[in-house]
């Protein structure tokens, strides 16, 4: 749970990146971000967590979990600097998967900026990201509806064999990317009730 594939654009072209979320029980929960992330990407992670918190009931997440579990979001290859808003939906999906322990759809990658209200905004570098997805053997790609025109401008040979999901909000992303099925050996996300003497 909590590992999702994103698509990034770099100076040397497109690449796939993985977003990993892990949870640990804590008396003073906090959000930790690692992987050499720039300020804009850090803001995306904060936004994504706020969105998941605000829509906890829709995801069947007990809100008290946020008060008892710390969140660690990591983007591997820490030596490579990463920035930009396009990982917003990827981070949100990673968080939702971690807090629900639901599996993430296989062979699926995504790219898109999110707003606090959950809108999915278009991002750049689409052609390069598509080529990176193809190289990695990814079949399903989720992106903003407003990026649909970019796909239509790409040579058809580049997009053959790919299925695109064009979304308008983060809930659409979750509906596509998160399976109903829980992961094997799910994390025990039970709520620790305060004992009488602590109250």
Regions found by a protein language model. Name each.
Residues 3-5, 12-199:
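Peripheral, non-AAA+ core regions of ATP-driven protein-machinery
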């Amino acid at each position: 749970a909590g590992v999702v594939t994103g698509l990034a654009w770099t100076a040397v072209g497109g690449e796939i990146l993985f977003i990993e979320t892990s949870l640990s029980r804590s008396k003073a929960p906090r959000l930790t971000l690692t992987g050499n992330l720039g300020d804009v990407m850090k803001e995306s992670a904060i936004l994504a967590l706020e969105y998941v918190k605000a829509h906890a009931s829709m995801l069947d997440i007990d809100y008290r979990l946020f008060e008892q579990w710390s969140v660690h979001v990591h983007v591997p290859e820490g030596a490579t600097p990463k920035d930009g808003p396009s990982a917003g939906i990827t981070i949100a999906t990673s968080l939702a998967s971690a807090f629900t322990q639901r599996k993430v759809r296989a062979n699926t990658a995504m790219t898109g900026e999110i707003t606090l209200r959950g809108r999915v905004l278009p991002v750049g570098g689409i052609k390069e990201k598509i080529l990176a997805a193809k190289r990695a053997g990814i079949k399903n790609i989720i992106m903003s509806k407003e990026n649909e025109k970019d796909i239509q401008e790409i040579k058809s040979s580049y997009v053959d064999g790919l299925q695109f999901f064009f979304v308008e909000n983060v809930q659409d992303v979750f509906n596509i990317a998160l399976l109903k099925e829980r992961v094997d050996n799910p994390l025990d996300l039970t709520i620790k009730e305060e004992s009488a003497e602590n109250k």
